[in-house]
Amino acid sequence: MIKVTRLNGQPFTLNALFIEQIECFPDTTITLSNGKKFVVKEDEEAVLEKIAAFYRKIQIFAMDQGIEEPE
């Protein structure tokens, strides 16, 4: 889950696993896999950072250990 802020200043928590698309035109709009849209104050880069941190937290995004696979 990631915490984001509506344009009216109200914070809310969103399940990042259901995010399908993030657009900026000019406000950041998050579209979920069910088609529901949320317009938030955070810019696209901030939302992407929150998603990556969430994925690392739940271990979907493994941290690079610097281990190279043999060719």
UniProtKB/Swiss-Prot annotation:
This is Swarming motility protein SwrD. Disruption phenotype: Mutation abolishes swarming motility, reduces swimming speed and torque of tethered flagella. It does not affect flagellar assembly, flagellar number or surfactant production. It holds the Pfam family FlbD. Required for swarming motility. Increases flagellar power, probably via the flagellar stator components MotA and MotB. It comes from Bacillus subtilis (strain 168). GO terms for biological process: bacterial-type flagellum-dependent swarming motility. Disulfide bonds: none annotated.
